[in-house]
Amino acid sequence: MRVRRDKNLEKILDVDPLVISKFPFKLKQDTIIELGSGKGTMISALALKNPSQNYLCVERDRTIASKAIEKFNDLNLKNINLIVSDIQHLTEIIENKVNTIWLTFSDPWPKNRHEHRRLTYKTFLDLYKKFLSPQGVIKLKTDNDKFFHYSLESMSEFGMKILYQTNDLHNSIKNLDNEMTDYEKKWSSLGKSINYLEASF
């Protein structure tokens, strides 16, 4: 669902110290990145639970990013930053490699002509490879079964290793440390099981 722009709310992005605006930005290797972080529900919960861990959100929609910053400030988080950007530009604006990349409930772009927009299409995988450390892991959650199977195939064809996969995250061992996104809460409340995978290059 499209979010109505709120230009007054978006002004926070120009002044808040949690927003990264000077590039290139040097990441610490232990930084955990969430790409397409939305309102930051999952990553803020992780940051609150792990105060010594560094987190970075990447969200291109300015109004949604503003809502995430409001949430981070309400929780008084100091171990999280946000970049407002399209994912395609990441290698131009960040330096160093990280150990964990989260893809959470990405747009599945179901039409074949939009395959190149899927965040697990080969061009995106090539992008992630450039800033993921050799021992790094990509973690993906989605309610969309077709997108999940597509992602498994795309990653395998790219030469990635599937380290773990399940079609029912909430009834798996991985749920012990799981924090839910807004979409995850919505779909799981309706009885939809959540797909999850971990993969490396």
Curated annotation (Swiss-Prot):
Catalytic residues (UniProt): D107
InterPro entries reported in the protein's UniProt record: SAM-dependent_MTases_sf, tRNA_(Gua-N-7)_MeTrfase_Trmb, tRNA_methyltr_TrmB_bact
EC category name: transferase
Binding site for substrate: K111, D143, T181, D182, Y183, E184
Role: Catalyzes the formation of N(7)-methylguanine at position 46 (m7G46) in tRNA.
Record family assignment: Belongs to the class I-like SAM-binding methyltransferase superfamily. TrmB family.
Protein name: tRNA (guanine-N(7)-)-methyltransferase
Species annotation: Mycoplasma mobile (strain ATCC 43663 / 163K / NCTC 11711) (Mesomycoplasma mobile)
Source organism phylogeny: Bacteria, Bacillati, Mycoplasmatota, Mycoplasmoidales, Metamycoplasmataceae
